Amino acid sequence: MGQDNIKVIARNKKARHDFFIEETYESGIILRGTEIKSVREGRVNLKDSFALVENGEVFLYNMHISPYKQGNRYNHDPGRKRKLLLHKSEIRKLIGKTKQRGYSLVPLSIYLKNNLAKIELALAKGKKKYDKRQEIAKKTAEREIRRAFKERQRY
């Protein structure tokens, strides 16, 4: 088989900071003509976006795709809800998980795979404030340990 040609367009950096990521899914996304042109230009924002399961289908909300520059009056609505394409078994699994308290569907990134737009969707559980503080403290401690090792290796 051929190589998968992947180009990351946008990442949701806040998602990994605000949530514990439990599982990730790759899903397709239904876009209109001017939307895919804007995505290819990299004019996408995933910051406050989330996904919900409605009537056995998964929809992505608050993903902002800027209007296409050369678009005319048929340009798309930047904040509309967009349908995600997942296998039926994955959707059933997500329905069960998202009904549990604290679980959400959060997009981690949008990318082009063989010229098709894909969303990396995560089943995530929200972090509390103290969880975020612990993670920041752990990262700074690891950074200081690496710095100390680097200093010792110099001499």
Swiss-Prot record:
Top-level lineage group: Bacteria
Gene Ontology cellular component terms for the protein in this record: cytosol
GO terms, biological process: trans-translation
GO molecular function, one term: RNA binding
Entries under InterPro entries matching the protein: SmpB (IPR023620), SsrA-bd_prot (IPR000037), SsrA-bd_prot_CS (IPR020081)
Location relative to the cell: Cytoplasm
PROSITE patterns from the UniProt entry: SSRP (PS01317)
Keywords in alphabetical order: Cytoplasm, RNA-binding
Family statement drawn from the similarity comment of this UniProt entry: Belongs to the SmpB family.
Main function: Required for rescue of stalled ribosomes mediated by trans-translation. Binds to transfer-messenger RNA (tmRNA), required for stable association of tmRNA with ribosomes. tmRNA and SmpB together mimic tRNA shape, replacing the anticodon stem-loop with SmpB. tmRNA is encoded by the ssrA gene; the 2 termini fold to resemble tRNA(Ala) and it encodes a 'tag peptide', a short internal open reading frame. During trans-translation Ala-aminoacylated tmRNA acts like a tRNA, entering the A-site of stalled ribosomes, displacing the stalled mRNA.
Entry-linked PANTHER family: SSRA-BINDING PROTEIN, TMRNA-BINDING COMPONENT OF TRANS-TRANSLATION TAGGING COMPLEX
Name by which UniProt lists this protein: SsrA-binding protein
